[in-house]
Regions:
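Charged catalytic cores and adjacent phosphate/nucleic-acid-binding surfaces used
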Residues: 6-10, 18, 209-210, 214-223, ...
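Accessory alpha-helical DNA-binding modules that contact the DNA backbone or grooves
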Residues: 5-19, 23, 33, 43-216, ...
């Protein structure tokens, strides 16, 4: 896959055609237009891609249907050449010769596009006249006053470039789910208490529990007469770093850490989120970041439609709109209308003709669908499914298997971790300290591992004597070495109840290709005593991508081994820094007969509560309690692991 500064040609779907979604096609067309402009292409060629992307964005028909029927050139703004590109992408999964365009543009030029106020024309100018190819080089040039003498520049424009770079550094990038929830739940709770607000709900990718989010979307039910007052109350909130806009129905702000300084109405917070984010210490958490937020105020009778629309995803909404059209209805953020009834009326003017809805479930009922939980709204089969899964709840978890103590790099003792699990109502806790090769994390020597095994046995005996319904499982997070073998010898691992196999020697794995890494992981899961494949790709959200691996092939092999009577489990590492296994693979794991373990990878007692985040990812991946290993009882697990 060709990639430049985070821009890339998307991978084709495995179950195509169609091999790409409309969203993918639009993104590629938008990116190609920019790349062509940076290269100095003919302005009409650039505009053709810009127009095509805009046209597809407003196309209500199903793109795959239009493509199959050969009607792309009938769509205004799509010429023969671009129609051919779209057809190839949808039917074959490939993108013609535009991959060479991605490869030809220096990555730094793409990165500069994120600087506020800077577009392709100026970036091209800086590159051609001064050879600038990175944000840092641009900063130095501006500080040295070398930009002001260029065409269409000056001292003020130069200063704006520096201001833009400073803003980018402060506000750029996506946020992890936990950061989004930290701000989002608090902001929603604050708005819910404002006079004039009847209902409010966090929407967008945060509500859908995406692993990272771009900004916050909140929908509030407010009568028109109260909008001005509610707007004033929002703008009076503490910690607003900037106001991007405040109109008649929408307020756009940037929130900073100071938002938490005066305390948050915790009575309005989700209990699971509150516990996962730090419990009573929630208000004291330092996020060291900012986040954009949009608050949309709509009349109460419109609220369910606006909430559904801004929850998304775009792809899910497109499918809903098409389903509505198939039934003679029109669906948007203001309502669900019989097409014949509203004519040319739009927006709130048409809302009085809408079919009634007090909750989102009513919208789905009108469209002859079961209610789709927000986590599933990604156009991954939720519309077609005859029955949707009963998604796992965090309360169904009875323990976890991947946790650390002071024996390696944890900050709590074996006894403290066990007591924290007991306090959470769990039946068991699995310990998996690092293995000997990971000295940076104080990995245990074989002798230390055996000593820990004895400590676990002694604690279990004491609980059994005291009739306490709790036990520890003794495991190890054994490094998967580059050749796919496990740290420690088989004899040294024999004292363990379970083995969590994880990759930590990332430099080697990151350098290798997909085939080598896949073969090594498959070799690892084929080891008789490997129980759980831990954080399968090694990614750190916002820090590094995972190593290349064919996860489908790995999960397929694990399923084969399970069919032969073994127990091979894949982990959703619930740390909000990882959330790995990615939710996109969860349904496939289930189909292959591979159980999932939601593990917090806890290094402290508070870290145990990260399982809540892992549960959100499991839900997003269509998983039920029966798919989760640690929803089973301690007695069941004793039989499985021994």
């Amino acid at each position: 896959m060709v990639s430049v500064a985070g821009w890339s040609l998307p991978r084709p779907r495995r179950n195509g055609p169609p091999f790409h979604s409309k969203s993918n096609v639009i993104t590629v067309l938008e990116q190609v237009a920019v790349l062509l402009e940076l290269e100095g292409a003919n302005v009409f060629r650039v505009r053709s891609y810009q127009n095509a992307s805009r046209t597809l964005g407003s196309l209500e028909e199903d793109l795959w249907t239009v493509t199959q029927e050969g009607r792309l050139t009938d769509v205004k703004g799509i010429g023969k050449g671009i129609a051919g590109l779209i057809t190839e992408a949808m039917t074959e999964g490939t993108w013609g010769d535009i991959s060479s365009l991605y490869a030809s543009v220096p990555p730094g030029l793409i990165q500069m596009l994120a600087i506020p106020g800077l577009g392709p024309k100026k970036i091209k100018l800086f590159h051609e006249e001064l050879g600038i190819e990175s944000i840092e080089e641009l900063r130095v040039a501006a500080e040295d006053e070398r930009l002001r003498n260029l065409e269409r520049m000056g001292a003020k424009s130069e200063a704006k470039v520096l201001d833009g770079i400073a803003l980018l550094e402060r506000f750029s990038g996506r946020r992890r789910l936990d950061v989004g929830l930290l701000y989002g739940e608090a902001l929603e709770a604050s708005i819910a208490e404002m006079k004039g607000v009847e209902r409010t709900q966090l929407a967008g990718s945060t509500r859908r529990r995406k692993e990272t989010i771009g900004d916050l979307d909140i929908v509030a039910a407010v009568n028109p007469a109260d909008v001005a007052s509610v707007t004033e109350q929002i703008l009076a909130l503490p910690g607003i770093a900037d106001v991007k806009g405040a109109g008649s129905s929408k307020v756009s702000i940037i929130l900073g850490t100071e938002f938490f300084d005066s305390g948050i109405p915790s009575t309005g917070l989700d209990g699971g989120v509150l516990a996962a984010l730090g419990g009573e210490a929630y208000e004291e958490l330092a996020t060291n970041t900012t986040i954009d937020a949009q608050i949309r105020m709509v009349p109460p009778h419109v609220f369910p439609f606006t909430l559904a629309y801004f929850t998304g995803s775009k792809e899910h909404n497109v499918r809903l709109r098409q389903r509505a059209l198939d039934r003679g209805l029109r669906l948007n953020e203001f309502g669900l209308f019989p097409v014949d009834a509203v004519g040319e009326l739009k927006g709130l003017e048409a809302a009085e003709f809408s079919l009634p809805a007090t909750e989102e479930a009513d919208i789905y009922r009108h469209l002859e669908l079961d209610y789709v939980p927000p986590e599933l709204r990604e156009d991954t089969g939720e519309i077609e499914a005859s029955t949707l899964p009963s998604l796992v709840e965090a309360s169904a978890l009875k323990g976890a298997f991947h946790n650390h103590t002071t024996a390696s790099d944890g900050v709590a003792s074996l006894e403290q971790m066990a007591q924290a699990a007991i306090d959470m109502g769990w039946e068991y806790l699995g310990i998996a300290d690092h293995s000997q090769i990971l000295q940076i994390a104080s990995g245990l020597s074989p002798g230390e591992l055996l000593e820990q095994s004895e400590s676990v046995r002694a604690l279990n005996e004491s609980w059994a004597d005291g009739k306490k319904d709790f036990r520890l499982f003794h495991g190890s997070e054994c490094d998967i070495l580059p050749d796919g073998t496990l740290d420690y010898t088989a004899a040294e691992r024999a004292c363990l109840d379970h083995v969590v196999g994880s990759v930590h020697q990332l430099p080697t794995w990151m350098k290798r290709d997909e085939d080598e890494n896949t073969a090594a992981l498959i070799h690892a899961v084929e080891q008789d005593d490997l129980t759980i494949l831990g954080h399968p790709t090694g990614r750190i959200l916002g820090g590094r991508d995972g190593f290349e691996v064919d996860m489908h092939a790995v999960l397929r092999r694990m399923g084969e081994l399970n069919a032969e009577g073994e127990l091979k489990v894949v982990e959703i590492n619930a740390s909000p820094y990882r959330l790995d296994l990615d939710w996109r693979f969860c349904k496939f794991a289930k189909e292959q007969g591979v159980p999932v373990a939601i593990n917090p990878d806890a290094h402290s007692t508070q870290g145990l509560k990260d399982v809540w985040f892992g549960t959100q990812i499991a839900r997003k991946g269509w998983l039920e309690a029966t798919d989760i290993l640690n929803c089973r009882s301690g007695a069941d697990l004793e039989r499985l692991l021994w």
